[in-house]
Amino acid sequence: MSDTLLTLRDVHINFPARKNWLGKTTEHVHAINGIDLQIRRGETLGIVGESGCGKSTLAQLLMGMLQPSHGQYIRSGSQRIMQMVFQDPLSSLNPRLPVWRIITEPLWIAKRSSEQQRRALAEELAVQVGIRPEYLDRLPHAFSGGQRQRIAIARALSSQPDVIVLDEPTSALDISVQAQILNLLVTLQENHGLTYVLISHNVSVIRHMSDRVAVMYLGQIVELGDAQQVLTAPAHPYTRLLLDSLPAIDKPLEEEWALRKTDLPGNRTLPQGCFFYERCPLATHGCEVRQSLAIREDGRELRCWRAL
């Protein structure tokens, strides 16, 4: 059995941005720009980057909500079951359904199981995620933010998925609750043999959970490797700047490492060379050409000729 569950090969996703009077698209938004990626069985792959880099678009692609404009998205196996846990638990739960029906809705859609079977499953999953079974007839508004996210996690588990995409699973929660949810996810992964794709702009969350980390910038992966390597000794200039931007009391940012431009380039007209060229403090001759993802000696994949 292959250890690779999902494979992306040179995937691009474009959205129409402007049309002429004939209805023909004249301008596109380039959300994903040539991603090559393999997701392995049992791992947690962290996806990190600033707002607008394409993280959530990648999540929608993995879930099948979007199709590639170019390239291939391959799922190994005949029936690869995937689920998603969303950023805001309240908006992702039906306010008119009791919790037991919310948790078992994927099972009802797939198999039309009896109410007795679904109630039994809801009670079992509720215990696993830390919700008391006697609360299952309540509506979502009766729960706190952390409890709602536990309900969303239980719903994702109900169809026995192979892969769960976690799109900012703790960003809408209080700090005191975030660690509880992360620890719950780790426990469930061990018990169910799950594979996670964890999407976040919070480097601390990525550091806590991930086996590998992919750093995204303007719809591309610029650095991919072991989480410990990437987060402690970043090789790509963008990764280093991203980590240096985290608040630190006794670690001022070196002047030569300041961004040349603070604004993220637009994604309607892509840069001609390296996508980070206009902002990179190390930009020099050779950076004006497109950079491909190359493998370094330590096994990391980088999109920067200077860091190889």
Swiss-Prot record:
What is a single molecular function from GO for this protein? ATP binding
User: What species is this protein from?
Assistant: Escherichia coli (strain K12)
Q: What's one GO BP annotation on this UniProt entry? A: protein transport
Q: Name one GO cellular component term.
A: ATP-binding cassette (ABC) transporter complex, substrate-binding subunit-containing
Query: Where mainly located?
Result: membrane
**What does this chain do?**
Part of the ABC transporter complex DdpABCDF, which is probably involved in D,D-dipeptide transport. Probably responsible for energy coupling to the transport system.
**InterPro entries reported in the protein's UniProt record:** AAA+_ATPase (IPR003593), ABC_transp_ATP-bind (IPR050319), ABC_transporter-like_ATP-bd (IPR003439), ABC_transporter-like_CS (IPR017871), Oligopep_ABC_C (IPR013563), P-loop_NTPase (IPR027417)
Oligomeric form and interacting partners = The complex is composed of two ATP-binding proteins (DdpD and DdpF), two transmembrane proteins (DdpB and DdpC) and a solute-binding protein (DdpA).
Which cysteines pair up through disulfides? They are: none
Q: How does it sit in the membrane?
A: Peripheral membrane protein
Localization annotation? Cell inner membrane
What conditions trigger expression of this protein? Induced by RpoS in stationary phase.
Q: Where along this sequence does the record place binding of ATP?
A: 49-56
Domain (ABC transporter): give its ranges. Answer: 8-243
The gene it comes from is ddpF
Cell inner membrane is among the record's keywords: yes
Q: What's this protein's family per the entry?
A: Belongs to the ABC transporter superfamily.
Superkingdom of source? Bacteria
Q: Which keywords, in A-to-Z order, does the entry hold?
A: ATP-binding, Cell inner membrane, Cell membrane, Membrane, Nucleotide-binding, Peptide transport, Protein transport, Transport
Under which name does UniProt file this protein? Probable D,D-dipeptide transport ATP-binding protein DdpF
